[in-house]
Amino acid sequence: MGPNRIYISVGYSTFGMLVGFSAFIVWNVVYKQPWTAAMGGLSGVLALWALVTHIMYIQDYWRTWLKGLKFFMFVSSVFSLLAVAAFATFITLSVIEKQSLSDPKSFYLSAVWSFMTLKWAFLLGLYSYRYRQEFADISILSDF
């Protein structure tokens, strides 16, 4: 990744982390909706994980720990499956209970945050895969 592109990714991950943690606090304190809060908080944690991935890339830490990137890809796939299951569950519950789209306590917002969690899980896996490919190529060349 180019130097400007990596810093854009760092900024985007930071913004995602702040928004996710804000959703966690707001839906716990103001709306008393734990499911939306949980999915918002999980989205923030995955954004934080993506941020850590970028920072470790900038500090050139991944060169010596490619197994860590493999672990991050595994975690990404687990949380992707969890997010898809949560999305389907929340949409189903919203339809069955005939909830309003504009109600802040509806399961539709939980489904939205489940989708955001899926997005961050996918991005974590994508970034980990790209960094692993980059450093795997470099480590092959350094063996000669």
UniProtKB/Swiss-Prot annotation:
<dbReference type="GO" id="GO:0030670">
    <property type="term" value="C:phagocytic vesicle membrane"/>
</dbReference>
<feature type="short sequence motif" description="Di-leucine motif">
    <location>
        <begin position="140"/>
        <end position="141"/>
    </location>
</feature>
<feature type="transmembrane region" description="Helical">
    <location>
        <begin position="6"/>
        <end position="26"/>
    </location>
</feature>
<dbReference type="GO" id="GO:0015232">
    <property type="term" value="F:heme transmembrane transporter activity"/>
</dbReference>
<keyword id="KW-0458">Lysosome</keyword>
<dbReference type="InterPro" id="IPR026218">
    <property type="entry name" value="HRG"/>
</dbReference>
<keyword id="KW-1133">Transmembrane helix</keyword>
<dbReference type="GO" id="GO:0015886">
    <property type="term" value="P:heme transport"/>
</dbReference>
<keyword id="KW-0472">Membrane</keyword>
<dbReference type="GO" id="GO:0005764">
    <property type="term" value="C:lysosome"/>
</dbReference>
<keyword id="KW-0968">Cytoplasmic vesicle</keyword>
<dbReference type="GO" id="GO:0010008">
    <property type="term" value="C:endosome membrane"/>
</dbReference>
<dbReference type="GO" id="GO:0005765">
    <property type="term" value="C:lysosomal membrane"/>
</dbReference>
<comment type="similarity">
    <text>Belongs to the HRG family.</text>
</comment>
<keyword id="KW-0967">Endosome</keyword>
<dbReference type="Pfam" id="PF16954">
    <property type="entry name" value="HRG"/>
</dbReference>
<dbReference type="GO" id="GO:0005886">
    <property type="term" value="C:plasma membrane"/>
</dbReference>
<feature type="transmembrane region" description="Helical">
    <location>
        <begin position="71"/>
        <end position="91"/>
    </location>
</feature>
<feature type="transmembrane region" description="Helical">
    <location>
        <begin position="38"/>
        <end position="58"/>
    </location>
</feature>
<keyword id="KW-0813">Transport</keyword>
<comment type="function">
    <text>Heme transporter that regulates intracellular heme availability through the endosomal or lysosomal compartment. In macrophages, is the heme transporter for heme-iron recycling. Essential for macrophage iron homeostasis, transports heme from the phagolysosome to the cytoplasm during erythrophagocytosis (EP).</text>
</comment>
<protein>
    <recommendedName>
        <fullName>Heme transporter hrg1-B</fullName>
    </recommendedName>
</protein>
<dbReference type="GO" id="GO:0020037">
    <property type="term" value="F:heme binding"/>
</dbReference>
<feature type="transmembrane region" description="Helical">
    <location>
        <begin position="107"/>
        <end position="127"/>
    </location>
</feature>
<keyword id="KW-0812">Transmembrane</keyword>
